[in-house]
Design a protein with these regions (language model features):
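Gly/Thr-rich phosphate-binding beta-strand-loop-beta motif of the actin/hexokinase/Hsp70
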Residues: 14-45, 193-229
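Gly/charged contiguous loops adjacent to phosphate- or pyrophosphate-bearing nucleotide/cofactor binding elements
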Residues: 83-84, 88-94, 98-101, 105, ...
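Acidic low-complexity intrinsically disordered segments
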Residues: 7-11, 174, 297, 381-445
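Phosphate-binding loop and its immediate beta->loop->alpha context
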Residues: 41-171, 180, 244-283, 439-445
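Phosphate/oxyanion-binding active-site loops and adjacent basic polyanion-contact surfaces
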Residues: 115-129, 160, 178-182, 238-243, ...
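Conserved phosphate-binding catalytic cores of ATP/NTP-utilizing and phosphoryl-transfer enzymes
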Residues: 2-21, 177-207, 366-381
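Short beta-alpha connecting loops at secondary-structure transitions
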Residues: 47-51, 81, 226-236, 254-256, ...
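Conserved phosphate-binding/catalytic loops in two-lobed NTP-binding clefts
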Residues: 171-184, 345-370
């Protein structure tokens, strides 16, 4: 491979590990993966090194991407740099392996260049490289065991949860717990805002607009117990969609169309520009082929308003359903990179009041930090609930299909040693032999 043209940062000084072992919280995000260390009440974000040619690319926001070039797979920042350098020479890039998990099925394979590889294997390899980078950042031997709390989007299917958990374990991590991402953010928010976080009693709505997914969860928090009572989400709504909108405005204004590596580079440029927007910003000046393209913030917000409206509609839904049970949210907490957009906070404050809407101090790292807190807090309990309905499809006499729900969405999962008993009305089958078709879904009409 040729030498990278990308400027890189050097490795930072290693953080000492205290206690009996190495525990971390990991946020495997659509755009970036972030790791927080559980170090005796401190939860620093690790800067992770990845080798690329003769350089070390170090970052605390690891791109969740994989590249293939010249018979080799590369991961994270190395994959991103390789694609920018060698796109015209045959390098291929998956910008987000996490998006592949939305519709994952066992045995699913994808083609990268001339290589055919299973999604499960790609995911395992990405996590293995992540593990090596964690140990390297802390000057620990490759054989050191890492205990981790990980997270998934709140509306993840059982298949996505399974393949994520299995890939982490196959990569050598010892998984202590898997949490929903909004629950992780709630843990971080409570520890950030309250001095006596073990004596908190509050109802909190988490608005989590990440790179590729949106989740909102209504949590009832009492002392050290977190109960995610209601959850809604969209698997393909996130900051990446806002980046595409902004890039389309740049293309329109500059009369250009970006493809391949140039498009990937420009998406990075517009993302950085998007993250620089403040409540007082009027225009964005974006460098494009040695010229500055000016985009009015008003035009960008008009184009992106439908995405924000879609997310707020889901918040309204869970708040309304919770209020039917005589509950009222004390806080609406904004987390995730997409929540940094001023238009998001502005609309939510208009809807729910300025005093209720809060931005976290670490909106980009709240999930990783929350997971790290859980990793070293055995008394902190997060109740598990089913994220989707689960049932059996039945064909009626007229040929129509009906779903017999076995477990309803929101069903509290039992603790170890407990069982769930579910009673459903019986029906008389026409045959005493058949093929069961199971269904997992977010809603049933």
């Amino acid at each position: 491979m040729g030498k990278s043209k990308k400027k890189t940062k050097g490795s930072k000084k290693a953080i000492p590990v205290s206690g009996k072992g190495l525990r971390v919280g990991i946020d495997f995000g659509t755009s970036h993966t972030i790791v927080a260390l559980a170090d005796g009440g401190n939860h620093p974000i690790l800067t992770l090194p990845f080798d690329y040619d003769d350089e070390v690319l170090s970052t605390d926001r690891v791109q969740s991407c994989i590249a293939h070039y010249d018979g080799h797979f590369l991961y994270g920042p190395a994959a991103h740099a390789c694609y920018l350098d060698h796109c015209e020479e045959g390098a291929v890039l998956i910008r987000s392996i996490k998006r592949l998990l939305v519709d994952w099925y066992e045995g699913q394979e994808i083609e990268l260049g001339r290589e055919v590889i299973s999604v499960e294997e790609l995911l395992k390899n990405f996590f293995f490289e992540l593990k090596l980078a964690i140990l390297r950042s802390l000057d620990l031997s490759p054989g050191t065991e890492i205990e981790a709390v990980i997270s998934v989007p709140a509306n993840s299917s059982s298949a996505q949860r399974y393949v994520t958990l299995k890939a982490f374990r196959d990569a050598g991590f010892k998984i202590l717990r898997i949490l929903d991402e909004p629950s992780s953010s709630a843990i971080q928010f409570v520890h950030e805002r309250y001095k006596r976080w073990d004596r908190v009693q509050a109802d909190v709505v988490i608005y989590d607009l990440g790179g590729g997914t949106f989740d909102t969860t209504y949590l009832a928090i009492k002392n050290e117990t977190y109960d995610p009572r209601l959850t809604r989400g969209v698997a393909r709504l996130g900051g990446d969609d806002f980046d595409e909108i902004l890039l389309s405005l740049v293309e329109e204004e500059s009369s250009q169309s970006f493809e391949g590596a140039e498009r990937v580079r420009m998406l990075d440029v517009v993302r950085e520009a998007k993250e620089s927007i403040t409540p007082r910003s009027k225009n964005l000046h974006i460098e494009c082929d040695d010229r500055l393209v000016t985009i009015k913030i008003k035009d960008f917000e008009n184009e992106a308003s439908n995405l924000v409206d879609e997310s707020i509609a889901l918040v309204d839904d869970i708040v309304e359903r919770a209020s039917e049970g005589e509950s009222e949210a004390d806080r609406v907490v904004l987390v995730g990179g997409g929540s940094l957009l001023p238009m998001v906070a502005k609309r939510l404050r208009k809807r729910y009041g300025r005093s209720k809407v809060h931005k976290g101090i670490y909106p980009l790292a709240s999930v990783a930090i929350g997971n790290a807190i859980q990793a070293e807090s055995p008394d902190l309990a997060v109740r598990d609930r089913l994220s989707n309905h689960f049932g059996v499809i039945r064909v009626c006499e007229d040929g129509s299909e009906y779903v017999d729900v076995i477990f309803e969405k929101g069903q509290v999962l039992p603790n170890q040693g407990e069982t769930i008993r579910v009673e459903r009305p019986p029906y008389d089958p026409r045959y005493n032999i058949g093929r069961f078709r199971y269904l997992e879904c977010d809603s049933i009409e």
